[in-house]
Regions:
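Short helix-coil boundary/hinge micro-motifs
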Residues: 1-134, 138-142, 178-181
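Residue-level signal for short amphipathic helical patches enriched in basic/charged
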Residues: 73, 147, 162
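Residues immediately within or flanking Cys/His clusters that coordinate Zn2+
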Residues: 130-137, 153, 158, 164
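Basic DNA-binding region of bZIP-type proteins
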Residues: 159-178
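Short amphipathic alpha-helical interaction/hinge segments
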Residues: 93-94, 148, 169
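Short linker/helix segments within small regulatory modules
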Residues: 146-153
Length: 181
């Protein structure tokens, strides 16, 4: 199965957000059904997790919460939704026989990845809040974690949105030139 994700190098909560995308002008949900979930679990390197309707519902809920929190930091309802997801699990620290270990415990296995995504979002909010951004591309709904040195990444990808923006600017300039000349 080819990787269906539009951006392969993003952290889990951003990966989750980017399951809602626009392809060929249509809104697509990579997590529309259990088959989609199975493919996505493989793509994010977690093929061992069961692709179940309950897991799908948990990820939908986490996705809405992550989106709400990122789109509007003052959205209390989104914050409560995220906290409800986080409430379903915890990370336990222990010294295992192979050394220090941190074990994620969830009440219901279906919540595991949703919990991990919410927890990873907290980590990103602690250190990199301003580097979690939506693509500036016209009609693009993708998000990214800007890990560039300058912290000025604008586009999900230079090859798509970046080039389209450049072409539009160029087009606007040449139209300008015609009007003046
Ligand atoms: Zn984009």
């Amino acid at each position: 199965m080819p990787d269906p994700r539009p951006l392969p190098d993003e952290p889990l909560p951003i990966d989750l957000l980017n399951t809602e995308l626009i392809a060929s002008g249509r809104r697509v949900d990579l997590l529309a059904d259990v088959d989609g979930l199975r493919t996505w679990l493989e793509a994010v390197g977690r093929p061992e997790l069961p692709a179940s309707p309950a897991g799908l519902a948990a990820l939908h809920e986490a996705r809405a919460a992550v989106r709400g929190v990122l789109e509007d930091a003052g959205d209390d309802a989104a914050r409560r939704r995220l906290n409800a997801v986080l409430d379903r699990g915890r990370r336990r620290e222990e010294l295992g026989d192979a050394g220090p270990a941190s074990v994620v415990e969830v009440r219901d296995e279906a919540d595991r990845l949703a919990w991990e995504a919410a927890s990873a979002l907290l980590q990103l909010l602690r250190t990199d809040r301003h580097r979690l951004r939506a693509c500036d591309g016209h009609d693009c709904v993708l998000w990214f974690h800007d890990t560039s040195r300058s912290g000025r990444r604008q586009w999900c990808s230079m090859a798509t949105c970046g080039n389209r923006a450049k072409a539009r600017r160029h087009h606007a300039r040449s139209k300008d030139g015609t009007a003046k000349g």
